[in-house]
Amino acid sequence: METQEGVSKQSIRERIWDYMESHDIADFPRPVHHRIPNFKGAAQAAGHLPHLQAFHVARTIKVNPDAPQRNARFLVLESKKTLLVPTPRLRTGLFNKITPPPGATKDILRKCATSQGVRNFSVPVGLDSSVLVDLVVVGSVAVSEKGWRIGKGEGYADLEYAMMVSMGAVHKGTPVVTIVHDCQVVDIPEALVEDHDLTVDYILTPTRVITTGCARPKPTGIMWSKVSCEMLTKIPVLRNLREREKQAGKDVTLRDEPGSQQPAPGPIRRPQDRPQTGSRGGSRSPLQGADTQLAATVCVGNLPFTTRVRELKRVLQELGVVPLRLTWQGPQHRAVLHYTDSAAAQQAASLLQGLRLGANALRVSLGQQRDM
Protein backbone atom coordinates (compact mmCIF):
# COMPACT_ATOMS: atom_id res chain seq x y z
CA MET A 1 0.00 0.00 0.00
CA GLU A 2 1.05 3.60 -0.55
CA THR A 3 0.02 6.66 1.39
CA GLN A 4 -0.36 10.24 0.25
CA GLU A 5 1.28 13.33 1.63
CA GLY A 6 -0.74 15.35 4.10
CA VAL A 7 -2.43 12.40 5.72
CA SER A 8 -2.86 11.91 9.46
CA LYS A 9 -2.02 8.92 11.62
CA GLN A 10 -5.72 8.15 11.97
CA SER A 11 -6.35 8.26 8.23
CA ILE A 12 -3.50 5.78 7.74
CA ARG A 13 -4.99 3.51 10.40
CA GLU A 14 -8.45 3.62 8.84
CA ARG A 15 -7.10 2.95 5.37
CA ILE A 16 -5.15 -0.11 6.50
CA TRP A 17 -8.00 -1.51 8.60
CA ASP A 18 -10.41 -1.07 5.69
CA TYR A 19 -7.95 -2.62 3.22
CA MET A 20 -7.30 -5.68 5.39
CA GLU A 21 -11.02 -6.32 5.84
CA SER A 22 -12.01 -5.72 2.21
CA HIS A 23 -9.19 -7.90 0.82
CA ASP A 24 -9.82 -10.76 3.28
CA ILE A 25 -6.38 -10.37 4.86
CA ALA A 26 -7.79 -9.86 8.35
CA ASP A 27 -7.98 -12.77 10.75
CA PHE A 28 -9.73 -13.38 14.08
CA PRO A 29 -10.61 -11.32 16.08
CA ARG A 30 -12.61 -9.30 13.57
CA PRO A 31 -13.32 -6.65 12.60
CA VAL A 32 -9.73 -5.49 13.00
CA HIS A 33 -10.67 -1.82 13.32
CA HIS A 34 -9.33 -0.17 16.48
CA ARG A 35 -7.04 -3.16 17.11
CA ILE A 36 -3.51 -4.26 16.38
CA PRO A 37 -4.84 -6.26 13.41
CA ASN A 38 -4.39 -9.99 13.22
CA PHE A 39 -3.78 -11.25 9.71
CA LYS A 40 -3.48 -14.39 7.64
CA GLY A 41 0.19 -15.31 7.55
CA ALA A 42 1.01 -13.90 10.99
CA ALA A 43 2.61 -17.18 12.10
CA GLN A 44 4.71 -17.24 8.93
CA ALA A 45 5.87 -13.66 9.54
CA ALA A 46 6.80 -14.48 13.13
CA GLY A 47 8.74 -17.48 11.83
CA HIS A 48 11.50 -15.10 10.72
CA LEU A 49 12.14 -14.07 14.32
CA PRO A 50 14.49 -16.94 15.34
CA HIS A 51 16.70 -16.16 12.32
CA LEU A 52 17.56 -12.68 13.59
CA GLN A 53 20.94 -12.37 15.28
CA ALA A 54 19.25 -10.14 17.87
CA PHE A 55 17.03 -13.10 18.78
CA HIS A 56 19.95 -15.54 19.00
CA VAL A 57 21.84 -13.43 21.54
CA ALA A 58 18.76 -12.38 23.54
CA ARG A 59 18.01 -14.03 26.86
CA THR A 60 14.91 -12.04 27.84
CA ILE A 61 12.38 -10.95 25.21
CA LYS A 62 9.27 -8.82 25.67
CA VAL A 63 6.43 -9.59 23.25
CA ASN A 64 3.12 -7.77 23.17
CA PRO A 65 -0.05 -9.79 23.99
CA ASP A 66 -1.92 -9.24 20.72
CA ALA A 67 -3.09 -12.09 18.47
CA PRO A 68 -0.64 -11.60 15.55
CA GLN A 69 2.30 -12.09 17.95
CA ARG A 70 1.06 -15.42 19.34
CA ASN A 71 3.56 -17.47 17.33
CA ALA A 72 6.36 -15.10 18.34
CA ARG A 73 5.55 -15.80 21.98
CA PHE A 74 5.61 -19.54 21.29
CA LEU A 75 8.99 -19.31 19.53
CA VAL A 76 10.48 -17.45 22.50
CA LEU A 77 9.27 -20.16 24.87
CA GLU A 78 10.36 -22.97 22.54
CA SER A 79 13.85 -21.46 22.46
CA LYS A 80 13.91 -21.58 26.28
CA LYS A 81 14.28 -17.83 26.55
CA THR A 82 12.55 -15.71 29.18
CA LEU A 83 9.25 -14.32 27.85
CA LEU A 84 7.78 -11.13 29.27
CA VAL A 85 4.30 -10.00 28.21
CA PRO A 86 2.82 -6.59 29.11
CA THR A 87 -0.29 -6.72 31.25
CA PRO A 88 -3.36 -5.67 29.21
CA ARG A 89 -3.63 -1.88 29.31
CA LEU A 90 -1.02 -1.96 32.11
CA ARG A 91 -3.84 -2.34 34.66
CA THR A 92 -1.97 -4.41 37.23
CA GLY A 93 1.69 -3.74 36.52
CA LEU A 94 4.14 -3.42 33.67
CA PHE A 95 4.54 -7.00 32.53
CA ASN A 96 4.28 -10.66 33.51
CA LYS A 97 6.86 -13.40 33.16
CA ILE A 98 5.45 -16.50 31.46
CA THR A 99 6.36 -19.64 33.40
CA PRO A 100 5.42 -22.86 31.57
CA PRO A 101 5.02 -25.97 33.73
CA PRO A 102 8.12 -28.21 34.03
CA GLY A 103 8.55 -30.54 31.08
CA ALA A 104 6.02 -28.65 28.96
CA THR A 105 5.45 -30.12 25.50
CA LYS A 106 5.14 -27.99 22.36
CA ASP A 107 1.36 -28.18 22.68
CA ILE A 108 1.55 -26.84 26.23
CA LEU A 109 3.95 -24.09 25.12
CA ARG A 110 1.49 -23.10 22.40
CA LYS A 111 -1.22 -22.84 25.04
CA CYS A 112 1.09 -20.72 27.20
CA ALA A 113 1.49 -18.37 24.22
CA THR A 114 -2.27 -17.72 23.95
CA SER A 115 -4.03 -14.95 25.85
CA GLN A 116 -5.52 -17.53 28.20
CA GLY A 117 -2.12 -19.11 28.73
CA VAL A 118 -0.60 -15.74 29.50
CA ARG A 119 -3.17 -15.37 32.27
CA ASN A 120 -2.74 -18.89 33.64
CA PHE A 121 1.02 -19.36 33.45
CA SER A 122 2.53 -16.07 34.56
CA VAL A 123 3.89 -14.18 37.53
CA PRO A 124 4.10 -10.38 37.76
CA VAL A 125 7.40 -8.56 37.39
CA GLY A 126 7.62 -5.55 39.70
CA LEU A 127 9.35 -2.21 39.24
CA ASP A 128 12.11 -3.24 41.63
CA SER A 129 12.99 -6.33 39.61
CA SER A 130 16.44 -6.09 38.06
CA VAL A 131 15.16 -7.37 34.73
CA LEU A 132 17.03 -6.54 31.53
CA VAL A 133 15.10 -6.89 28.27
CA ASP A 134 17.33 -7.82 25.33
CA LEU A 135 14.73 -7.66 22.55
CA VAL A 136 11.32 -5.99 22.20
CA VAL A 137 8.59 -7.30 19.86
CA VAL A 138 5.58 -5.05 19.24
CA GLY A 139 2.54 -5.03 17.02
CA SER A 140 1.70 -2.19 14.65
CA VAL A 141 -1.14 -0.91 12.54
CA ALA A 142 1.28 0.65 10.07
CA VAL A 143 5.05 0.87 9.72
CA SER A 144 7.41 2.36 7.18
CA GLU A 145 10.65 0.90 5.85
CA LYS A 146 12.40 3.78 7.60
CA GLY A 147 11.21 2.44 10.96
CA TRP A 148 8.39 4.90 11.67
CA ARG A 149 5.57 3.10 13.48
CA ILE A 150 1.86 3.80 14.01
CA GLY A 151 -0.08 1.86 16.65
CA LYS A 152 -3.81 1.68 17.23
CA GLY A 153 -3.85 5.15 18.76
CA GLU A 154 -3.92 4.50 22.50
CA GLY A 155 -0.18 4.89 23.06
CA TYR A 156 0.37 1.79 25.17
CA ALA A 157 3.36 0.40 23.23
CA ASP A 158 5.07 3.80 23.37
CA LEU A 159 4.33 4.08 27.08
CA GLU A 160 5.45 0.50 27.81
CA TYR A 161 8.81 1.21 26.20
CA ALA A 162 9.20 4.53 28.01
CA MET A 163 8.41 2.85 31.32
CA MET A 164 10.98 0.14 30.61
CA VAL A 165 13.54 2.88 29.99
CA SER A 166 12.61 4.55 33.28
CA MET A 167 13.09 1.32 35.24
CA GLY A 168 16.36 0.52 33.45
CA ALA A 169 15.03 -2.56 31.64
CA VAL A 170 16.02 -1.33 28.16
CA HIS A 171 18.61 1.05 26.75
CA LYS A 172 19.03 2.98 23.52
CA GLY A 173 20.61 -0.02 21.81
CA THR A 174 17.83 -2.50 22.61
CA PRO A 175 16.44 -3.64 19.23
CA VAL A 176 12.72 -3.40 18.50
CA VAL A 177 10.94 -5.75 16.08
CA THR A 178 7.43 -5.49 14.66
CA ILE A 179 5.45 -8.26 12.95
CA VAL A 180 2.97 -7.10 10.29
CA HIS A 181 1.40 -8.03 6.96
CA ASP A 182 3.06 -6.71 3.81
CA CYS A 183 0.13 -4.35 3.24
CA GLN A 184 0.89 -2.63 6.55
CA VAL A 185 4.31 -1.47 5.30
CA VAL A 186 3.58 1.99 3.91
CA ASP A 187 5.15 5.40 3.48
CA ILE A 188 4.65 7.48 6.62
CA PRO A 189 5.52 11.18 6.52
CA GLU A 190 8.24 11.91 9.07
CA ALA A 191 6.25 14.97 10.14
CA LEU A 192 3.78 12.59 11.81
CA VAL A 193 6.49 11.05 14.02
CA GLU A 194 6.74 12.57 17.49
CA ASP A 195 9.45 12.31 20.14
CA HIS A 196 7.42 9.89 22.27
CA ASP A 197 6.74 7.54 19.32
CA LEU A 198 8.52 4.19 19.35
CA THR A 199 10.48 3.36 16.20
CA VAL A 200 11.44 -0.13 15.01
CA ASP A 201 14.68 -1.72 13.84
CA TYR A 202 13.27 -4.81 12.12
CA ILE A 203 10.01 -5.46 10.25
CA LEU A 204 8.91 -9.05 9.75
CA THR A 205 6.22 -9.81 7.15
CA PRO A 206 5.14 -13.11 5.60
CA THR A 207 7.46 -12.43 2.64
CA ARG A 208 10.22 -10.14 3.93
CA VAL A 209 12.64 -9.27 6.69
CA ILE A 210 13.31 -5.53 6.59
CA THR A 211 16.22 -3.97 8.47
CA THR A 212 15.19 -0.33 8.82
CA GLY A 213 18.51 1.16 9.90
CA CYS A 214 16.43 3.72 11.79
CA ALA A 215 18.70 6.31 13.39
CA ARG A 216 15.94 8.34 15.03
CA PRO A 217 16.38 8.15 18.83
CA LYS A 218 13.83 6.07 20.69
CA PRO A 219 12.03 7.55 23.71
CA THR A 220 14.48 8.17 26.56
CA GLY A 221 11.86 7.86 29.28
CA ILE A 222 8.34 8.90 30.12
CA MET A 223 7.31 12.26 28.68
CA TRP A 224 5.00 13.32 31.50
CA SER A 225 3.74 16.28 29.49
CA LYS A 226 2.10 13.72 27.16
CA VAL A 227 0.45 11.77 30.02
CA SER A 228 -3.09 12.72 31.08
CA CYS A 229 -4.52 12.65 34.58
CA GLU A 230 -7.00 10.02 33.38
CA MET A 231 -4.20 7.75 32.19
CA LEU A 232 -2.38 8.17 35.49
CA THR A 233 -5.53 7.11 37.32
CA LYS A 234 -6.01 4.04 35.14
CA ILE A 235 -2.41 2.81 35.42
CA PRO A 236 -1.24 2.39 39.04
CA VAL A 237 2.29 1.37 38.05
CA LEU A 238 2.62 4.64 36.13
CA ARG A 239 1.75 6.56 39.25
CA ASN A 240 4.40 4.64 41.15
CA LEU A 241 7.01 5.57 38.55
CA ARG A 242 5.90 9.18 38.64
CA GLU A 243 6.44 9.37 42.38
CA ARG A 244 9.92 7.91 41.99
CA GLU A 245 10.87 10.41 39.32
CA LYS A 246 9.35 13.25 41.32
CA GLN A 247 11.52 12.31 44.29
CA ALA A 248 14.51 12.27 41.95
CA GLY A 249 13.81 15.92 41.11
CA LYS A 250 12.42 15.44 37.60
CA ASP A 251 9.60 17.51 36.12
CA VAL A 252 6.55 15.25 36.23
CA THR A 253 3.86 17.79 35.34
CA LEU A 254 1.04 16.13 33.43
CA ARG A 255 -0.51 17.26 30.18
CA ASP A 256 -3.83 18.37 31.68
CA GLU A 257 -2.77 18.92 35.27
CA PRO A 258 -3.96 22.20 36.85
CA GLY A 259 -0.95 24.23 37.90
CA SER A 260 -2.22 24.65 41.46
CA GLN A 261 -3.37 21.07 42.01
CA GLN A 262 -0.79 18.35 41.52
CA PRO A 263 -2.10 14.87 42.29
CA ALA A 264 -0.86 13.71 45.65
CA PRO A 265 1.45 10.69 45.48
CA GLY A 266 -0.43 8.97 48.30
CA PRO A 267 -3.56 6.79 48.01
CA ILE A 268 -4.10 5.28 44.59
CA ARG A 269 -7.67 5.10 43.35
CA ARG A 270 -8.88 2.60 40.80
CA PRO A 271 -10.53 4.09 37.68
CA GLN A 272 -14.23 4.74 38.22
CA ASP A 273 -15.30 2.54 35.35
CA ARG A 274 -17.80 0.42 37.28
CA PRO A 275 -20.36 2.56 39.13
CA GLN A 276 -21.33 1.17 42.51
CA THR A 277 -24.98 1.42 43.48
CA GLY A 278 -26.22 2.53 46.85
CA SER A 279 -23.67 5.31 47.41
CA ARG A 280 -24.15 9.02 47.65
CA GLY A 281 -22.53 11.43 45.28
CA GLY A 282 -22.20 9.03 42.34
CA SER A 283 -19.98 6.02 41.74
CA ARG A 284 -17.34 4.81 44.14
CA SER A 285 -14.31 2.61 43.75
CA PRO A 286 -14.51 -0.80 45.45
CA LEU A 287 -11.31 0.16 47.27
CA GLN A 288 -12.87 3.22 48.89
CA GLY A 289 -14.91 3.43 52.05
CA ALA A 290 -12.97 1.10 54.35
CA ASP A 291 -13.26 1.64 58.09
CA THR A 292 -10.49 3.81 59.48
CA GLN A 293 -9.12 1.13 61.81
CA LEU A 294 -8.84 -1.31 58.91
CA ALA A 295 -7.54 1.14 56.30
CA ALA A 296 -3.97 -0.12 56.63
CA THR A 297 -4.87 -3.75 55.86
CA VAL A 298 -5.56 -5.49 52.57
CA CYS A 299 -7.44 -8.78 52.30
CA VAL A 300 -6.47 -11.00 49.38
CA GLY A 301 -8.96 -13.78 48.66
CA ASN A 302 -9.65 -16.52 46.11
CA LEU A 303 -6.09 -17.81 46.38
CA PRO A 304 -5.59 -21.10 44.51
CA PHE A 305 -5.77 -24.19 46.70
CA THR A 306 -2.15 -25.06 45.89
CA THR A 307 -0.72 -21.61 46.67
CA ARG A 308 1.87 -21.46 49.44
CA VAL A 309 2.63 -18.41 51.53
CA ARG A 310 6.12 -18.12 50.03
CA GLU A 311 4.59 -17.81 46.55
CA LEU A 312 2.39 -14.92 47.64
CA LYS A 313 5.35 -13.26 49.35
CA ARG A 314 7.34 -13.53 46.13
CA VAL A 315 4.55 -11.87 44.15
CA LEU A 316 4.31 -9.06 46.71
CA GLN A 317 8.05 -8.54 46.55
CA GLU A 318 8.05 -8.39 42.76
CA LEU A 319 5.27 -5.80 42.85
CA GLY A 320 7.16 -3.77 45.44
CA VAL A 321 4.34 -3.93 48.02
CA VAL A 322 5.82 -6.12 50.79
CA PRO A 323 3.68 -5.70 53.95
CA LEU A 324 4.90 -5.23 57.51
CA ARG A 325 3.12 -8.45 58.42
CA LEU A 326 1.21 -11.15 56.55
CA THR A 327 -1.54 -13.19 58.19
CA TRP A 328 -1.97 -16.45 56.27
CA GLN A 329 -5.47 -17.95 56.27
CA GLY A 330 -4.86 -21.00 54.08
CA PRO A 331 -8.08 -22.93 54.82
CA GLN A 332 -10.09 -19.87 53.71
CA HIS A 333 -7.82 -19.39 50.65
CA ARG A 334 -6.95 -15.85 51.68
CA ALA A 335 -4.35 -13.70 53.38
CA VAL A 336 -4.43 -10.39 55.24
CA LEU A 337 -1.64 -7.91 54.53
CA HIS A 338 -0.78 -5.31 57.17
CA TYR A 339 0.84 -2.03 56.09
CA THR A 340 2.19 1.05 57.86
CA ASP A 341 -0.60 3.36 56.71
CA SER A 342 -3.63 3.63 54.46
CA ALA A 343 -1.62 5.06 51.56
CA ALA A 344 0.62 1.99 51.44
CA ALA A 345 -2.40 -0.30 51.76
CA GLN A 346 -4.29 1.41 48.94
CA GLN A 347 -1.23 1.29 46.70
CA ALA A 348 -0.89 -2.45 47.34
CA ALA A 349 -4.61 -3.02 46.75
CA SER A 350 -4.49 -1.13 43.46
CA LEU A 351 -1.54 -3.14 42.16
CA LEU A 352 -3.07 -6.45 43.27
CA GLN A 353 -6.54 -5.71 41.88
CA GLY A 354 -7.24 -7.93 38.86
CA LEU A 355 -4.09 -9.99 39.35
CA ARG A 356 -4.22 -13.73 38.70
CA LEU A 357 -2.42 -16.56 40.43
CA GLY A 358 -2.74 -19.65 38.28
CA ALA A 359 -6.29 -19.69 36.95
CA ASN A 360 -7.72 -17.66 39.85
CA ALA A 361 -8.41 -13.93 39.74
CA LEU A 362 -7.58 -12.56 43.18
CA ARG A 363 -10.28 -10.79 45.18
CA VAL A 364 -8.80 -7.73 46.80
CA SER A 365 -10.34 -5.35 49.32
CA LEU A 366 -9.24 -2.88 51.95
CA GLY A 367 -9.86 -4.10 55.48
CA GLN A 368 -10.39 -7.63 56.75
CA GLN A 369 -13.44 -8.80 54.87
CA ARG A 370 -15.04 -11.99 56.21
CA ASP A 371 -16.99 -12.83 53.08
CA MET A 372 -14.63 -13.23 50.14
From Swiss-Prot:
Region (Disordered): 246-289
Biased composition (Basic and acidic residues): 246-258
GO function terms (MF aspect): RNA binding
Keywords: RNA-binding
Keyword field contains Magnesium: no
One Pfam family from the record: 5-FTHF_cyc-lig
Domain RRM span(s) in chain numbering: 296-369
PANTHER family per the UniProt record, alphabetical: 5-FORMYLTETRAHYDROFOLATE CYCLO-LIGASE-RELATED, METHENYLTETRAHYDROFOLATE SYNTHASE DOMAIN-CONTAINING PROTEIN
Protein name as it appears in the record: Methenyltetrahydrofolate synthase domain-containing protein
Name of encoding gene: Mthfsd
